[in-house]
Amino acid sequence: MTTQTSTGLRHQTVLLDEAVDALIWRDDGIYIDGTFGRGGHSRRILERLGPGGRLVAFDKDPAAITEAGTVEDARFAIEHDSFAQMAQCLDARGIERVAGVLLDLGISSPQIDEGERGFSFRMDGPLDMRMDTTRGITAAQWLAEADERDIARVIRDYGEERFAVQIAKAIVARRGQSGDRGPLDRTSELAALVAQAVKTREKGQDPATRTFQALRIHVNQELADLETGLKAAFDRLEQGGRLVVISFHSLEDRIVKRFMQALARPEQSAAPELRRAPLRAHELPAPQLRLLGRVKPSEAEVSANPRARSAIMRVAERC
């Protein structure tokens, strides 16, 4: 589904049919779309729900909340918050159990294509990178104040960047200069600085890709939110309920895979002394999730939407 947003920008929802097919197993259930984005998944879910179904969506982005305001459906509700706050928000709505949770962890095309948001290294704009522009510090503010070791750690750990130390040194050195060469506050400045610091090139990838990813993850606490959100989602699932997660880079996918496998194969994640003990079948820890598989976009989808190429969808069902 290509969504024409209220701002006129277009967004192609990744794994649209595959995700909704995996999520909806009864049409009268309560479902969660943890990342409304520009509404592609939410609108398709509403098409599939019966009169008794409900959908609660979450998003930190004010632009997504504006877009959600165009959904005219009494079965739909939107929360201006992270899916990490799912438990509190559902409690406030009196919802104890849900039939399914969908988390699409990708950044939306309008966020990338709108230079003013600060996510893109290809378009000049303020070095912001906040999903929620109403709260928190910007990437520029953090880079202007953070310790060099912290900058290197974030770029290395969240961007898997080999040249993290060199990039961090260049950022801190830039802070000590005066005039127009002072602290970074534009995306184009950061992209140019990284290009000078990164000595080798990966085929088909801009040298700034990993650094921009790392800063976005850090500014928005994406991995911490993911771990909290996965636990909250599992805790709310009813028996037979589905957990569907679409990730776009290896850091996210490792967290999702580890979380699902720990609940599906608890005997493998048990303490070493328990794994070595001679236990009878009824003494083994019972699985709490059943893994339903992993799906990647088809060649046709990637051809139509190159941004889908790194997507991996994992599906599990509560036992």
Swiss-Prot record:
The Gene Ontology biological process terms listed for this entry are: rRNA base methylation
Q: Name one GO molecular function term.
A: rRNA (cytosine-N4-)-methyltransferase activity
Residues at which S-adenosyl-L-methionine binds:
39-41, 59, 83, 104, 111
Query: In its keyword annotation, does this UniProt entry include Transferase?
Result: yes
> Which Gene Ontology cellular component terms are annotated?
cytoplasm
Which InterPro entries does the protein's record reference?
RsmH, SAM-dep_MeTrfase_MraW_recog, SAM-dependent_MTases_sf
User: Which EC number applies?
Assistant: 2.1.1.199
> Record keywords: Cytoplasm included?
yes
> Mind telling me which residue stretches traverse the membrane in this protein?
none
The record describes the protein's role as: Specifically methylates the N4 position of cytidine in position 1402 (C1402) of 16S rRNA.
By sequence similarity, the record places it as follows:
Belongs to the methyltransferase superfamily. RsmH family.
Query: What name goes with this protein?
Result: Ribosomal RNA small subunit methyltransferase H
Source organism of the structure? Ralstonia pickettii (strain 12D)
